């Protein structure tokens, strides 16, 4: 009886030790160790091909590591397994955005926002990228709407306020553009683009 108990304890302790030693790809991603996170996720997928969470972290790490073409492919691979995983939809949108595929990226961000909870962590990010796409397309009123939604979700990012100011400036909405630039400079007094934007407006309204 004692031997059986000891054997069970040994198995349990061994399993616990293995779990403790198992690499944590998400932790690596959060800590900025993108290359290692990618390696771990690919190993997990090789061992368990249908593991959607591994695809999700993999794509986050690939985008963060600026491997956009690979991220596009791996997000598509993940969606072939879990076509309704909105985390992969958003990651695919980011990859396509950086690859200049604006129309496809915009559709993916719209799909993500329509399907995800309003409190999801990357809703603000999706709105931000939509705003940037609209700026690329010179649709500045649309960009204003999207970037306004983005800063409502993430109000402490001076870069986002600066881009909102730029969209409003391009739409000739100088009063609100100045307000956005001022907010950016409140958050970061050395925000160069916000300072430049304010100077342009001041020069053009003299």
Tell me what each language-model feature is.
Residues 30-31, 64-65, 98-99, 132, ...:
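Register position in tetratricopeptide repeats
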Residues 57-60, 91, 125, 129, ...:
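Canonical tetratricopeptide repeat
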Residues 52-53, 86-87, 120-124, 158-159, ...:
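Helix-start (N-cap) detector for alpha-helical repeat units in TPR-like alpha-solenoids
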Residues 17-56, 206:
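N-terminal leader/linker segments that initiate helical-solenoid repeat arrays
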């Amino acid at each position: 009886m004692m031997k059986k108990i000891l054997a069970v304890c040994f198995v349990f302790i061994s399993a616990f030790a293995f779990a403790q030693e198992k690499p944590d790809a998400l932790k690596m991603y959060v800590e900025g160790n993108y290359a290692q996170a990618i390696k771990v996720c690919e190993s997990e997928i090789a061992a368990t091909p249908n593991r959607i969470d591994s695809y999700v972290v993999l794509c986050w790490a690939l985008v963060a590591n600026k491997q956009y073409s690979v991220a596009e492919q791996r997000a598509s691979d993940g969606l072939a397994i879990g076509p309704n995983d909105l985390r992969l939809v958003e990651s695919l949108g980011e990859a396509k955005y950086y690859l200049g595929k604006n129309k496809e990226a915009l559709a993916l961000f719209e799909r993500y926002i329509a399907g995800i909870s309003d409190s999801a962590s990357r809703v603000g990010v999706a709105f931000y990228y939509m705003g940037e796409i609209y700026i690329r397309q010179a649709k500045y009123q649309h960009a204003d709407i999207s970037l306004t939604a983005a800063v409502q979700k993430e109000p402490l990012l001076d870069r986002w306020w600066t881009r909102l100011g730029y969209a409003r400036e391009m739409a000739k909405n100088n009063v609100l553009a100045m307000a956005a630039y001022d907010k950016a400079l409140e958050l970061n007094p050395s925000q160069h683009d916000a300072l430049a934007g304010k100077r342009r407006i001041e020069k053009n309204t003299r």
